[in-house]
Amino acid sequence: MKFFPLLALLFLAGCAAPHARRTDVLFWNQPQREAAFRAMESHYASNVVRHGEAHPLPAGAPLAPRFADGTTLDTYMSSHRVAGVMVVQDGRIRLQRYGLGAGPATRWTSFSVAKSFTSTLVGAALRDGAIHSLDDKVTRYIPELAAGAYRDVTVRQLLEMTSGVRWNEDYVDPHSDVAMMYEGARQPGVPLLVTYMSRLPREFPPGERWVYKTGETDLVGILVTRATGKSLAAYLSEKIWMPYGMGADALWLKDDVDGTEAGGSGVSATLADYARLGQFVLDGGIAAGKPVLADGWIADATRRHSDIGAPGRGYGYQWWTYDDGSFEGIGIFGQLLHVDPRRHLVIVQLAAWPVATDDAQAKARAEFVRAVNRAVDGR
């Protein structure tokens, strides 16, 4: 998958290459990240997600996060290169703060938070009858996979990331699957990602073990597009972005040759619209007074389906789950969409961490969520 960045980006990179791979974002330097995360559409091909009349998010009582070590919010945001945070409780904005030169109109990339978007569109496609059942074989919708390791994998197992197909998600290895999945020779009429995934070997029986695989969410996105006959951007606009009332157009990155959108990443939206997506989920998936998702979808998608080997945590249908009932979409470089039904709470963070992920950054982000919870709980 080849994309053509601006000359300014090439200048920032200090390189002479005439184009960049989409996964080059994993290896950008800090100035590149902070410049490009707010303008991915300037560097890569994308589809527009049209918005409707904005769903109001009125101001609520101001909230000051209470960090256990006394850290201030400004210090936290500066130290971790945070572009924006928003806290919405009971449908009201209790905290909204920006950094890195971002503002209310800034569209910031979400990376793997987009996985939760794609999962939600599966719920819509089930309600519409475009997807018959989660127990359908993936090959019903993507027959090009029939000769490989995905031939016996179900839609549900893709959503759970329990296909058993071998995968390497190492963000610092330029030869890992996540770095190479948009590379290789194209076959006429076949998305490049499908060609790559069709050649992967099996490691475990389907359904036996969870392994995080961005490429599989890309397959889910292709499956939704095949089932509905619509691009992910168009379907998201039709089912959620317009009827629920997002405040601005969003963007979904795509392959500039075959037009395939990346279901596992690539959504860019404003801070407030990420919060609105969380509120849509809290509201039970209702838009314009009508249910958008299959009955019971939200409860099923946001409960633990897979053991990920972390106490108190699990994985649902492209949502990370917690034993307290909260769940979240997480993206590399610091992105977060946290939903807490018990507290009627949505927390969003957009950032440009200096690394894709590491324990120290992840712990700091988790402490930010706890700091918000302390303030909400009055403790």
Where is each model-derived feature located?
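Sec-dependent bacterial lipoprotein signal peptides
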Residues: 1-13
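N-terminal leader/targeting segments and the immediately adjacent pre-domain N-terminus
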Residues: 15-103, 128-131, 160, 195-198, ...
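Structured C-terminal helix/loop/strand segments within mature extracytoplasmic catalytic/sensor domains
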Residues: 16-27, 331-379
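Active-site SXXK
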Residues: 91, 108-134, 158, 220-224, ...
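Catalytic-site signature segments of enzymes, centered on catalytic residues
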Residues: 104-105, 170-172, 178-258, 265
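Active-site helix/loop module of the DD-peptidase/beta-lactamase fold
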Residues: 109, 128-168, 199, 226-265, ...
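Active-site-proximal alpha-helical segments within enzyme catalytic domains
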Residues: 216-223, 263-286, 335-352
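Active-site Gly/Thr loop motif
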Residues: 247-251, 298-347
